[in-house]
Structures are given as structure tokens and as C-alpha cells.
Amino acid sequence: MEYLHITKMLSSSLSPQNGTWSDAISLLLALGIALYLGYYWACVPQRPRLVAGPQFLAFLEQHCPVTVETFYPTLWCFEGRLQTIFRVLLQSQPVIPYRSEVLQTPDGGQFLLDWAEQPYSSHCPDPTTQPIVLLLPGISGSSQEPYILHLVDQALKDGYRAVVFNNRGCRGEELLTHRAYCASNTEDLETVVKHIKHRYSRAPLLAVGISFGGILVLNYLARTGKAGGLVAGLTMSACWDSFETVDSLETPLNSLLFNQPLTAGLCRLVARNRKSIEKVLDVDFAIKARTIRQLDERYTSVAFGYKDCAAYYHASSPRTKVDAICTPVLCLNAADDPFSPVQALPLQAAQKSPYVALLITARGGHIGFLEGLLPWQHCYMNRVLHQYARAVFQHSVGLPGLGALTPEDGKS
């Protein structure tokens, strides 16, 4: 009966005898909005799925309520690709006064660390023990990315010292060797952690990796075991399986929106450093790549000594290394992430691991996680960092393994 009533109203409104079409358009618009809102409230807001071993699960439920609370994605852009795109287009850029430091690497390369700190923190008046948040941006990102600026801003507000590890060449500096960076090679990250721990040996250190940076954090933890020098790790939108990632990015729409623009940016980095790279490979051939897979085949796998792209992807995928991780790490992923498909997440391995927890939201895209009607400022990622950092810095005794050793301790 309700359906017949609505049909009669529409027919009556659309009838020429009843005057203009404006009433019909208004009715259709109202009906469309009602259906949209009904769908949103019925299907979109959901509690995230938290997968972890018993001790880590209890720790997170007690100290990080965001892990069990309903996530409300932005009403007008909750689809994964829209979340990914609008995060880039809409988010503000906090002004962060960085202090840059150049680090030299054992192989003759260089990269930049960008430090951010408050002159005095009421949370931690002793600067030698002030907690440090180490941030690792995405594949072509730097300390200037809006999502990094917001996370740094959050860390500073919470009273921590923040430092951003910029991969080689990502802040415009020249490559001194043919190698830029790759997801399987954690040598530069090891250099960073040792440098920080040497300077601030008494300060607890939390590594936060976003996207590509998250892969580095996971591979670093798997490689170093209990000697990683971190109290904990946090990853956001990390890609767990490189094969699944490139397959997803090569679907038509994802290729147009993400794969091609990202590849073009990476090719510019290679072309800009032709002088150093052309000694070991054909730069002209490499920069003709139109996909991430092609560039990895022509440049990354060659520069880092892999037989081919498949060998590199096998080495770079953290999915198979969960058992080797011995430092607590919380991993935030969205089920609709176009870069990291949900089927790539190591659910069973995380459930058995004492140290790895997966926090999976139904929506959020890739480095999106926008929430609220006006998502210009902080988002879900900031809330996760705020609560998790506070938990690991203030309640580390409750973490699995009771914290981590320093790199120096691991050698003894």
C-alpha cells in the first residue's frame, strides 16, 4: 500500500494538469536523499574488526577504546576511492617548524630526517626521556604530506618529540648512489633507529608507518626480532602482499586514478637522478614505465639486486613474516582499500601472534579514514595514534613481551 501511495503521488506530480515540474523534482530529490541517508545509517557506520592474540587484544580494548568503537565515515564520501582522493584534496596542512638533519648511509647514500619538537613539554619535563614518534611516509611522500603533518601535529600536542624519516630523494635531495628505496630493504630504517637511540638512549620510541612506510616498519620488525629498539609499532594502510597490491592497482579504474599518477611521480624521481642511476641500468627504458609493476621490473628489482620483479615482491610482502615479529604492532587497514585488498590481510597469523594486531574498518580507503561532516582537520588516523601512543608510552608494562630491547642490547 505504501508503494502504491508513493507511485500515485509521483504520477500526480508529473502530470501536466498539476502545474510545473518543480514539485516533482523536489519530491524525487527528497526521496533520493532519504534513501541515501537510510543506506548510510543502515550499512556504513560499523565497529572495526580487531584481530589479535588474547593479551594484546585485552590491552587494546582497555587502553585504546577507538579500536572497539563504531567508526562513522564522512557522510558524503564514504566509498574507498573517494576517501582516498578527498583526503588529498580537502585536508588542511598544519604549519610544522621542522629542523632537518642529513644522515649519511654506509653505502654512500644520504637522506633527510625532519625533527619537530616543542621547546618544553609539560607532559614530560625531562627531554632525555621524552617519548619519540618516528613517522615513515608513503612511497613517494615526505614530511610535507598533509597526513604526515597532521600526525606530527598530533604527536606534538600529546607532548612527544616527532621525527619524519624521508626516503632517499623524496625531499628533493640528490641521490648519491643508484639506489633510492624499496619495501624489502630496511637498512636505512636501521640507520635511523640506531641514530635516534644513540642520541636519546632513555627515550621510548614508537615507529608509525603509513602505506609504504608501514611495509618498512613490518619488515624491519620481522628482520630485527626483539632487537629492534622500539617499544611498539603502528602501521596505517600498509600493503601486506605486493602481488595483491599491483593486481588491484592494475584494474581499469584504479589504474587511472592511482597507478598511473603514482608511477609518473616515481619516474620523475628516477629521471631527476639519471646521473647516478644510469651507471647500472637503462634510465630511458625505466622511465617509460606506465605501472608500478613495470617500474619495479625495470628499476627497483635491478637496483636492489633481485632476479626479477616477482622475487622482489616475494621479499617485500610482510604477509608471510608475521611469525617473525616480536614487538607489539597495531595495523590499521580498511576493507575497501584499493591498494591493500582485504583478502591480503593475514587474519589467521595475527590471531595466533602475541605481537601483531589487525584493526580493520569496513570503510576508509587508502590513507583516508575521513570522519565527520567537515573532515578538514583531524581524522580517525589521528585518534588511533593519540590513543595507541598514550597506551604504549604510559602502560608499556601491559604490552606483550614487556617492551623491546635496543639494537645494542640485542647484540649482547
From Swiss-Prot:
Pfam families: Abhydrolase_1 (PF00561). One of its GO terms (molecular function) is monoacylglycerol lipase activity. It is a single-pass type II membrane protein. One of its GO terms (cellular component) is membrane. Glycans are attached at residue 18. Its EC number is 3.1.1.-. The active site is at 211 (charge relay system), 337 (charge relay system), 366 (charge relay system). The chain crosses the membrane at residues 24-44. It is found in: Membrane. It is an enzyme of class 3 (hydrolase). Its main location: membrane. Residues 131-372 form the AB hydrolase-1 domain. Keywords: Glycoprotein, Hydrolase, Membrane, Serine esterase, Signal-anchor, Transmembrane, Transmembrane helix. GO terms for biological process: medium-chain fatty acid biosynthetic process; medium-chain fatty acid catabolic process. It comes from the Eukaryota. Belongs to the AB hydrolase superfamily. AB hydrolase 4 family. This is Protein ABHD1.
